[in-house]
Design a protein with these regions (language model features):
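Non-ligating segments of multi-cofactor redox enzymes
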Residues: 1-229
């Protein structure tokens, strides 16, 4: 999206949000993955300026469209397309003028976006001891790299070719958030308490085994499992 088109979209979003409230209000809001530092009342504080979109070096942040009702024009992350790589200094946070992204967010430990959940372990290539093939990640490698950071993402993906799949663990920007545990000659990916819900694992998992649940906490999703262990 060009800067001109981006500006026009932002203005249109503001206009529609103000004049079509009666129509948008009938749409049930969805729960979306928000950028790092998003406060509890993010939807009411986000002014739809798009500054976070403009400064994100990974092009992870987008603005919600017309189908999203009252959330139209607010910033979100579609982890299945591009997760958040938790940049140094969090440029999206620094660019936010309204406080929708808390400026107290300066380190990864300050981030809480959600939590990753393994949905279908039987389809996991690591669990099946299958190797990564070019066809598996071609859609990711085909993305244009606009800077060194995006190229580094591709380099990590390429380094996994021909090896037993470990894309989620190797790509995760948070040390220790995803780990493998070996049980009965199989690799099982575990989501640990360090997970902040950045969504990178969902992006790189071509088997669609992992997804991020926005706003959820590790203890909520894994409490039952931990009790049984």
């Amino acid at each position: 999206m060009t800067r001109r088109n981006f500006t026009l979209f932002s203005l249109a979003s503001l206009a529609l949000a103000g004049t079509s409230g009666f129509m948008l209000g009938k749409v049930e809001p969805k729960v979306h993955l928000r950028p790092p530092g998003a406060v509890e009342n993010f939807e009411s504080l986000c002014i739809k300026c798009g500054q976070c979109v403009q400064v994100c070096p990974y092009h992870s942040i987008e603005l919600l469209g017309f189908d999203d009702g009252v959330n139209l024009g607010t910033a979100y992350i579609n982890a299945s397309k591009r997760g958040c790589y938790l940049c140094d200094l969090f440029p999206c946070v620094l660019a936010c003028p309204s406080g929708a992204l808390s400026h107290n967010t300066s380190e990864i430990k300050d981030v809480y976006m959600g939590v990753a959940v393994v949905k279908n372990l039987e389809q996991c290539l690591a669990f099946k001891t299958q190797s990564v093939e070019t066809s598996h990640i071609q859609h990711l490698l085909a993305r244009k790299s606009y800077n060194e950071r995006e190229q580094e993402v591709k380099d990590i993906l390429s380094a996994n070719l021909g090896k037993t799949c470990a894309l989620c663990v190797n790509s995760c920007p948070v040390n220790g958030a995803l780990v493998f545990e070996r049980k009965e000659q199989r690799q099982i990916v575990l989501v640990k308490d360090e997970c902040v819900g950045c969504g990178v694992c969902e992006e790189v998992c071509f088997a669609r085994v992992i997804e991020v649940v926005p706003h959820a906490k590790h203890r909520q999703k894994f409490k039952t499992k931990e009790k049984n262990e």
